[in-house]
């Protein structure tokens, strides 16, 4: 017999991180893999570059997100260009984060995303637009121009126009989880209904239940 640390799947960790950031909440994720062996861990650096208040406790293998306002205003050209060739599965979570970021995020070198469970570039563009987001795309890129729900002084941002609605998951687990998380960040009275949301079971069968233990408001 032997003891072995079983690390978290960074592709799964992305969703609670983004959910906390877009709702200006705090969450701690335990059992984090700090070995650098998973390319998707780079999403933390991307979120930090947007102003995400994220700390990594390497001794406890935990990651904590605190209340943050996401923006690209401090970046060159006022935009974030990120090459996702090493972790293309992050497209769904980052696209949702982009909807709540003051500025523009351009995700590049993601042509492979057109050959996943769905064409994730086309699908995310279509469903985010359905909810009021400004999204453009090309053969191997997608851009999201968003607005923070709050201004720098903490007051409500009148330019934040995302709204609720019914969206398709296309039986793609990452699409379903990302769009469900988007709904958490909408103003009171607005909600998102994801069709066939249970398709997330292919990778995270307890996703909604675990999120609800951390004060999400999912019903299914």
Where are these regions (language model features)?
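Short, structured segments at the rim of ligand-binding sites
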Residues: 1-220
């Amino acid at each position: 017999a032997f003891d072995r640390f079983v690390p978290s799947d960074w592709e799964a960790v992305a969703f609670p991180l983004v959910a906390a950031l877009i709702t200006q909440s705090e969450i701690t994720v335990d059992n984090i893999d700090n070995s650098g062996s998973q390319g998707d861990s780079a999403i933390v650096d991307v979120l930090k570059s947007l102003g995400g208040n994220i700390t990594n406790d390497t001794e406890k293998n935990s990651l904590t997100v605190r209340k943050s306002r996401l923006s690209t205003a401090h970046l060159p050209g006022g935009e974030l260009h990120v090459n996702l060739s090493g972790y293309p599965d992050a497209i769904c979570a980052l696209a949702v984060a982009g909807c709540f970021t003051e500025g523009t995020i351009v995700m590049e070198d993601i042509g492979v995303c057109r050959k996943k469970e769905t064409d994730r570039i086309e699908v995310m563009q279509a469903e985010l637009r359905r909810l009021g987001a400004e999204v453009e795309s090309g053969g191997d890129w997608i851009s999201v121009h968003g607005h923070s729900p709050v201004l720098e002084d903490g007051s409500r941002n009148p330019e934040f126009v995302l709204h609720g609605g019914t969206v398709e998951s296309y039986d793609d687990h990452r699409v379903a989880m990302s769009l469900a998380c988007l709904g958490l960040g909408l103003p009171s009275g607005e909600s998102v209904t994801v069709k066939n949301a249970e398709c997330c079971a292919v990778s995270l069968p307890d996703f909604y239940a675990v999120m609800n233990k951390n004060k999400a408001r999912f019903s299914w």
